[in-house]
């Protein structure tokens, strides 16, 4: 993927050949500036895929159309075989944003980047963790660092083998939810590095070694945690097995 005139020069000096070219239509990350499209170095490239990337495709803003028009301008100015502008959210903007190739990313993993795609995509990541220990709290007992949760009455809880080292961040403290056969198991107190405490009231038969599921439907989990759907996926640590 060529992103600059300098890279194009290096490519040609090394013998050239088929390549892809990224054009910056306004996101100001990678890509050749629009005003460099007419450079003779670009005219010498044998370009397969002419690409750009939308900055705000998950929102309904005028800048989407501005970028699409710049992409059309680039397509008209540069010889190429195929073109691509849209990722997952851009696909939902309509065929005018597609070109010959689209680049679904988040949606392949069950993410829903735009409301139009709700109900069309299925969750694919279902993290689970095991209960390491079951405890019986008494009224007045507190849980976890800084004692942010205190039991109001006797309560059965489970210590689960997942924490922020696995990507289950402290933002879930006191508001996250795990499940067993559809039954809610709220997070109690602070999420620790390697463990999280949950309320077992709804599933009193659970014991050490049993597995519970994280509430990880991406749109809902993003709304609850304040994290993006992308962060929720990429945070999942290497300690998870498939």
Please describe what each predicted stretch is.
Residues 14, 43-44, 77, 93-95, ...:
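Solvent-exposed alpha-helices and their adjacent loops that cap or buttress functional pockets
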Residues 60-154:
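Anionic-ligand-binding alpha/beta catalytic cores of soluble enzymes and soluble regulatory domains
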């Amino acid at each position: 993927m060529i992103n600059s005139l300098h890279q194009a020069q290096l490519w040609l000096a090394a013998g050239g050949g088929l390549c892809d070219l990224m054009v910056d239509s306004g996101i100001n990350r990678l890509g050749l500036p629009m005003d460099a499209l007419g450079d003779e170095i670009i005219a010498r490239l044998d370009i397969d895929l002419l690409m750009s990337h939308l900055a705000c495709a998950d929102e309904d803003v005028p800048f989407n159309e501005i970028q699409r028009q710049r992409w059309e301008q680039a397509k008209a100015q540069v010889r190429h075989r195929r073109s691509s502008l849209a990722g997952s959210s851009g696909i939902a903007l309509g065929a005018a944003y597609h070109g010959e190739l689209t680049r679904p990313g988040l949606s392949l993993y069950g993410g829903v980047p735009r409301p139009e795609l709700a109900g069309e995509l299925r969750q694919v990541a279902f993290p689970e963790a095991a209960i390491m220990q079951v405890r019986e709290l008494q009224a007045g007992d507190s849980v976890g660092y800084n004692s942010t949760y205190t039991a109001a009455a006797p309560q059965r809880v489970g210590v689960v083998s997942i924490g922020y080292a696995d990507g289950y961040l402290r933002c879930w403290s006191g508001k996250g939810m795990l499940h067993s056969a559809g039954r809610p198991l709220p997070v109690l107190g602070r999420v620790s590095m390697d463990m999280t405490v949950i309320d077992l009231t709804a599933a009193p038969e659970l014991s050490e070694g049993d597995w519970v599921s994280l509430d990880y439907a991406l749109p809902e989990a993003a709304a609850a945690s304040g994290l993006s759907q992308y962060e929720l996926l990429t945070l999942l640590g290497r300690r998870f097995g498939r």
